[in-house]
Amino acid sequence: MAYIAVPAVVDSRSSEAIGLLESFGVDAGADANDVSYQDHDYVLDQLQYMLDGYEAGDVIDALVHKNWLHHSVYCLLPPKSQLLEYWKSNPSVIPDNVDRRLRKRLMLKKDLRKDDEYNQLARAFKISDVYAPLISSTTSPMTMIQNLNQGEIVYTTTDRVIGARILLYAPRKYYASTLSFTMTKCIIPFGKEVGRVPHSRFNVGTFPSIATPKCFVMSGVDIESIPNEFIKLFYQRVKSVHANILNDISPQIVSDMINRKRLRVHTPSDRRAAQLMHLPYHVKRGASHVDVYKVDVVDVLLEVVDVADGLRNVSRKLTMHTVPVCILEMLGIEIADYCIRQEDGMFTDWFLLLTMLSDGLTDRRTHCQYLINPSSVPPDVILNISITGFINRHTIDVMPDIYDFVKPIGAVLPKGSFKSTIMRVLDSISILGVQIMPRAHVVDSDEVGEQMEPTFEHAVMEIYKGIAGVDSLDDLIKWVLNSDLIPHDDRLGQLFQAFLPLAKDLLAPMARKFYDNSMSEGRLLTFAHADSELLNANYFGHLLRLKIPYITEVNLMIRKNREGGELFQLVLSYLYKMYATSAQPKWFGSLLRLLICPWLHMEKLIGEADPASTSAEIGWHIPREQLMQDGWCGCEDGFIPYVSIRAPRLVMEELMEKNWGQYHAQVIVTDQLVVGEPRRVSAKAVIKGNHLPVKLVSRFACFTLTAKYEMRLSCGHSTGRGAAYNARLAFRSDLA
C-alpha cells in the first residue's frame, strides 16, 4: 500500500481522485478500483485554526510526521463538570480506573450538588488520571502527531488539534454552547461510526509525510501555482526543510504501478520509488558507472646498476610490488635506465612517490624483503636502476572496509619516514581542479610537543641526563648507544620507564586539547610516531599504523638541524617504537593509493566533460536568516564544504537525490578572514550523531579524504560576529 501526496483537495469519490491524478499526467485507467482518496479538507481548517496560537513552522513540521496510512482519531472530552454529569446519567460508560468512591457516588440516583463527599472527590478528580495520552491546550503540535501515530484514539480536552478528525465523546449537549469551530467535516457527532483508512493499493492525499511508509510526492509540481494558500505554505516549508527526506515520483511510474506494468525507470527518484515498492525494474547502467576504487596494479622488475670505469654491473635484482598502473602512466615510466638521485644525493621525487605507493620490495635472489638505504654513501646504496619488465597485473580495491565513515585519518609512521618530502610532492598534485592533499590539511604530532615550554623533546633530554648521571648530550648518547649505534637493552629500558610517565602526564593532556581543536577545524590527516600517541589522546578518526620500504634509522642520521642532533633523534625513534602497540603495520602505499589513484581513474572518465555537470560539494548549510541575526550581510546562505566530489553527470544526478540532511553538526563560524582567494572565513564543526557513511557517497564518485572548514564569502561586505549554528549537510552542484 502506497501513499501519493498531491497538492490539491477534491471530493472523496474515487472518480474525482482518478481525475486528480490524470490532471497531473497519470494514466490511471477507467476502472482503477485500487485507488482511494483521503479527504484532507478538514486538515486545512485545523491548520488555519492552529496558526492562531502556534508558529507555522512548528505546526507544519509536526504535520509532516503524520502517518496517513495509520487510522487514528481525536476523542474530545467535555469539561470536567459535564463529564461527571454524563457519567452520572450513563454509569455503564464510567471507566474502570476511576476512583472507586467517586464511581459509587456517581451511581447513586440522587442530586449530588449538596453531597460534600462527592464535591470533595470531584475537586480532586483529574481527567489526565483516567485518559492517557491526553491532549490539552498546552500540548505541542509534535506531541499531538506522535500520539496519533502510536494509537487509534487520542483523548483531548481542546479542539485546537491537528492531523485527525475529532470524535465527540458525549452527546452535543454536554459541551459548551459553541465549539471553537463546528464544521461538520472536522467534528464527528457522538455515536457516529468513524471511517477507517481504506486498504487500497494506492492512497491519494494532500499532505506528504516522512512517517508514512512508501510515501511519494508527485514530481513536477509548481509550488507557486498552488491556489490554496495553506497548501502552498505547507509545500514551501516541506520542500525547503524536508526535501532530502521525501521521495518524488513521476506520473509515468505512477501510471505503470496502477496499471500493473513493468516499471520504466529513467531517473534516480523513480528507481528509489521502485525499490520502496519492491517492484521489479531494469536500469541499464551507462559507461559512467565505473568503480573508480578498483585499481589495476603490477609488479615492477628492476635492477640496481653500478657503472664503474665504463663497465655496467648489476649488483641486485629487485621486485617492487603492487605499483598502480595509473601512476606508471602519469610518471611515464617504461622499460629503460633511470638515475634516481638528485645532485645533492637525495632521491628524485618520482622515485620516492613510486616506492611509497608500492607494497615494498623483494630481493629476487634471496626472496627476502628489501629495504632501501637512503644514504648516498656506499656500500649498498642505489644510484641508478634499470626497469626490465612488468608482471602480475591484477586489480585491487583501494577502499578497504576500514574506511566505513568519512572521518579524519591518523597515519602512524616511524621517525625518518620522509613525511615532509612526500607531503611536498602530494601538495603539488592537482587533478580535475582538486588538490589531492594540501599541506594545510596535514597535522604532525610533533606540533604538540613543540607547543610546550620547554619542548617535550628538550624536557625528555634533560630528564635522561639525570638518569644517566651525565651533564652533556654527547655523554648521554654514549651511555645509551654502543659503537655500532645499537642501544644497550637495559639502559634503553631505563629510559623507556621514564618515558611512559612523561608521555602520560605531559604529552597526553596537551595532545587531547590539540586534537580536539584540530579535528574541529577540519577532516585533517594527522601524522604520529606511535599509535599510542593518538589512542591516549582520544583520537576518533581512522587509525592506520604504516611502514615504508626504507631504512628509517639511516634517514634519521642524514637529517640535520633536529632537536638534540641526529643521534638523540635515533634514541627517540627507538623509544617511540617501544611506545607503539603491537598492531601489525600496513604499507604506506595503501593510504597513498586511496588518495591518488581513484582521481586519476576519474580523470580518464570525465576529463573532457563540463566541470559544472561533474563537480559538487557536500557541506554544512546555514540559512542566511540565521547569519543575518549575527550581523552577516545575508547575500547568500552560509555553506562550509565538507566533501568535494567529482563524478560523471549521471552519478551526480543520483547523488543529488540522496538524503544528506540527516547528518548534522554544530558549526562555529568565526570572523577571522583566511589569507588568499577566494575570500573566506575560518570555521569549526563538531559532528552530532553519526558520521557520513562512505558508501553513501558511492563507489562511482571521487571524494576528498581531507577538508579544512571555511565559509566562502561571495561579496566584499564586512564580516559578522562569530557564532554557533546547528547545521545540516546539503548537496550543492550546478545541476541543482
Swiss-Prot record:
Subcellular localization, as worded in the UniProt entry: Virion; Host cytoplasm, Host cytoskeleton
Keyword entries, A-Z: Capsid protein, Host cytoplasm, Host cytoskeleton, Host-virus interaction, Inhibition of host innate immune response by virus, Inhibition of host interferon signaling pathway by virus, Inhibition of host IRF9 by virus, Interferon antiviral system evasion, Viral immunoevasion, Virion
Principal subcellular localisation of the protein: virion
Cofactor(s) this protein requires: a divalent metal cation
BP term (GO), one: symbiont-mediated suppression of host JAK-STAT cascade via inhibition of host IRF9 activity
GO cellular component: host cell cytoplasm; host cytoskeleton; viral capsid
Pfam family for this entry, one: Reovirus_Mu2
Listed GO MF terms: structural molecule activity
Job description of the protein: Minor inner capsid (core) component. Displays NTPase and RNA 5'-triphosphatase (RTPase) activities. ATP is the preferred substrate for hydrolysis. May function as a cofactor of polymerase lambda-3. Associates with microtubules and plays a role in the formation, structural organization and morphology of viral inclusions, where the assembly of cores and the replication of viral RNA occur. Together with mu-NS, recruits the other core proteins to these inclusions.
Complex formation: Interacts with protein mu-NS; in viral inclusions. Interacts with polymerase lambda-3; this interaction stimulates the ATPase activity of mu-2.
Family as reported in the entry's similarity comment: Belongs to the orthoreovirus mu-2 protein family.
Name listed for the protein in its UniProt record: Microtubule-associated protein mu-2
